[in-house]
Amino acid sequence: MKPVLLTLVVVTIVCLDLGYTRICLKQEPFQPETTTTCPEGEDACYNLFWSDHSEIKIEMGCGCPKTEPYTNLYCCKIDSCNK
């Protein structure tokens, strides 16, 4: 009986992932860098660079957004990988 119960516990842990969420660096233009826990379903981090002709701007966060022309986007799926 104990081996069956142990097997059920292990299967539950593996299948449910026990609430694991992605942690990404977050930064809006002209704001300090922080970390954020991504919402459920978002398993990627992004780093977006663009220029407005006077300076280079950087934005970081959760997800992998669609980009506009003349932007550089890097997406990754490891905690805090978007440095």
From Swiss-Prot:
Tissue distribution: Expressed by the venom gland.
Q: Which GO terms describe its cellular component?
A: extracellular region
Question: Looking at the record's lineage, which domain of life comes first?
Answer: Eukaryota
Q: Does the keyword Amino-acid biosynthesis apply?
A: no
Q: What are the record keywords, sorted?
A: Acetylcholine receptor inhibiting toxin, Disulfide bond, Ion channel impairing toxin, Neurotoxin, Postsynaptic neurotoxin, Secreted, Signal, Toxin
Q: Which Gene3D superfamilies match?
A: CD59
Q: What is this protein called?
A: Weak toxin DE-1 homolog 1
- Organism source for this protein? Ophiophagus hannah
